Amino acid sequence: MAISFGGLVYPWNSGQIIALFVVACVLVVVFLAQQIWSIGTTPERRAFPLQFFKNRSLSEVSVLECCASTLTYVPVYFLPLYFQFVRHDSAIMAGVRLLPLVVFLVVAIVVNGLFVTANGRYMPWFFAGEALSHAGSALLYTVDMETSNAKVYGYSILIGTGAGFFLRLPFSVVQSLVPPESIPKAIGFVTFGQLGAPSVILAVVNAAFLNEATNSIAKSFSSILRGTIITILSGVGSDAFARLEQSTQRQILRFIVAGLNKGYIVTMASGALALILSLFLNRGRMFA
C-alpha cells in the first residue's frame, strides 16, 4: 500500500505513507522473529524454512528464481500498456501482441527441460538465459513511440527465451541439493521467491511508472490538474485525453513511454545480478 499510494494518493513524506512503511517493517520483523525462534510452532513446522539460507547453492538458486520471475512478469505487465497507449490497441489486441514473448518462453522451458534431463548440466542454461534476458531488457528500455512493432516483438522474444531457459530450472536443481525428505520444503522455498519477488517488484515498477509520468506531465503542462493526469494515465481512451490538442497528446504519450521504460531498469538489474550469480553455480551435473 505504501508503494502503491506514494506520490499519487499521498506525498512520499506524508504521515500516511511513513506510517504504512513503519507498520510493514514492524510486521516483517515480527514475522522473522517468530520464525527464527519458532514462537508458537516447532522448527520442523515453520512456515518459512530459514535453515536453507545456510546452504549457499540453495540460496543462490532461490535468488535466481526471483530474478527469472521479475524478468518474466515485468514485460508481461508493461508491454500491453505500451501497445494500448501508443498503438491505441484494445485490451485483447494488446494481449495478443504478447504472444511472441509467451510462445518463445514456453518453447525455451520445454527445450531446457529436455536437455537438462538428458545431461544434467544446468549452469550453462542459467548463464545463457540471463545473458539473453539482460540484452532483451536493455533493448526494451530503448523503445519509444517510433519503434516498430517488429523490433518490440524481437526484443520481447529475447527476454522471453532467456527467462524461459531458467524460469523452471531452479525447481529441478533444488531437488539435487537437499535430502529427499527436505524436497517439499525446498520447492516451497523456491516458490516463495517465484511468487514473492514479482509481487513486490511489480508494485515498485508500477509506482515508478506512475510517479515518473505524472511528475513529467505536471511539470510540462501546469494547466492540467493532477487529478486529470491520473485520469489520463488510466487509459488513453479517456475523455480528458481526447479533449487535448494532438501535439499535447503526443508529448504526454512520450512521457508515458519514458515512464514505462523505467520498469526495464529493474529487469536489467535483475538480469545483471542473475548473470553474476550464475558464475558461482556448481558446474557439475544434477544427481551426479
Name each model-derived stretch.
Residues M1-L8, V23-G40, L275-L281:
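C-terminal membrane-cytosol helix-exit motif in multi-pass small-molecule transporters
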Residues I3, G7, F83-Q84, F115-T117, ...:
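Interfacial helix-cap and linker-helix signal at transmembrane-aqueous boundaries
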Residues N13-V26, V30-A33, W37-K185:
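Transmembrane core module of solute transporters
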Residues V29-A33, V106, V110, A138-Y141, ...:
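Membrane-embedded alpha-helical segments of multi-pass transporters/permeases
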Residues A33-T42, M145, N211, N215, ...:
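Helix-loop junctions on the cytosolic side of multi-pass membrane transporters
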Residues F53, V63-C66, F192, I252, ...:
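Hydrophobic alpha-helical elements at and bordering transmembrane segments
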Residues V152-T231, K262-V266, L279:
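Small-residue-rich alpha-helical segments with characteristic i,i+4
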Residues G237-A288:
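Transmembrane-helix exit segments and adjacent C-terminal regions of multi-pass membrane proteins
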